[in-house]
Amino acid sequence: QVIVINAPEKEGVATPTAEEILAIRDKVAASEVTAYEDNVVKEPLIAEGTVLKGSPVKKTVEDKQLGTTEWTLANGAKVVVKPTTFKADEVRLGVVGKGGLSLLSDEEYYMGEMMPAVNSMSGVGKFSATELKKQLSGKTASVQPSVENYTSAMGGVCSPKDIETMLQLLYLNFTQPRFNKDDVDNLTKMLLAQLANAKSNPDFLMQEKVADVTYGHNPRRQMISTEIVDKFDFEQLPGIYAKLYPGANGFVFTFVGNIDPETLKPLVEKYIGSIPAARKPINYVDDKAYPVKGEVTEEFTAPMQQPKVSVNYHFSGEMPYTLKNKMALTFLTQALNSRYLVSIREEKGGTYGVRVQGSTKYIPRETYSMTISFDTNEEMADELREIVMKEIEEIAANGPKSEDIEKHREFMLKSWKNSLEQNGAWMNYIQIKYGS
């Protein structure tokens, strides 16, 4: 018999002795353990007697190019349907509305950020997460809320035969979110334990510092900390959730997969149509949490078992949100990735790899950002930093190498062709059209 114990090696953490472990083993072996009996009784997800008033479709729009049908319901919900035959047993659901964490105060912000984890642990309606899993046994259907700085969302997936179950879960997530104090207390305990260990992780400390410096110590863009978790207030959670998901109007509900629109329509009218409308459609608020302007340099040290230097560059600014600019930034990041692979990894052997990532946004402003990061040793750090900037200046002056662009162009074309037969890709394309 082999017993394995894993525990962090740090001051204040007591590891049980061999004698204590064996005593626990002997106690369990001597106890009388009865077989587990699952006495779950299947119940309707939505309680019997619940009146679902529904809302009819009042407007229909066909998009021949995307192959979609758009319904606007009387309660203000917008529903987009894209039938496909890529996967016979898959229907995807995407729900997005503008708003997100921007609707919350600074004090509410991080509780809102943790809301998806709370939902996952607490269940929905009258069912705990464990009870819900049992109720859904034999079915393939799930719905999970998510939230970003400027959007509130939900995602779901089901088999075609279980689409009504998925819609019931969707209705419950909007109208009957569940908050259980024991579940939330367990979540906060888990977070505090993870954060206690993270404080000795130099990679976490680096991420924490980058977020703090990039956004000028803005309280809405910090890494989560023990101080933040200690301020979580269970009583505020229902009100915060209501701000994130106030009603059906302002949200776009997208279905992609093996669906028959005529079969789906009455179910949409029944369940999505029964989600109440908010007094005014959801929309985001510009919370002014922008990256700092100008050049800012920050250096710090942290204890580590294996010494290294981590370098992170963050470039950002305003840029018109156009397809041309998005493509240009994509090609720039790939050109830099190719150049750094040669000049830093292969020629200098200074790092396992340089990570270059770029993104564009149009909410709350039209902006771009690009990060360049790598790990190296102290002796080579300054030299590699010079190479990073030299490659950027070279592209700015003379443009990228044609072979780098052509290689990525071929990759993008191949990826795009493959994406045309993926439900997830079509979900993304449709949500981009509707401003998500």
Language-model features: where?
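Short intrinsically disordered coil segments
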Residues: 18-24, 109-112, 327-331, 389
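Bilobed periplasmic-binding protein/Venus flytrap-like ligand-binding cleft at the lobe interface
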Residues: 174, 272, 329-339, 387-395
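Conserved short beta-strand edge segments in small beta-sheet-based binding/regulatory domains
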Residues: 180-186, 281-282
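Phosphate-interacting basic helix/loop segments used at nucleotide- and nucleic-acid interfaces
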Residues: 234
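Conserved alpha/beta enzyme-core scaffolds, especially Rossmann-like or related mixed alpha/beta domains
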Residues: 244-246
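M16 family metallopeptidases and their MPP-like homologs
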Residues: 1-8, 80-82, 87-176, 186-196, ...
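Proteolytic maturation boundary segments
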Residues: 1-105, 252-254, 259-303, 307-316, ...
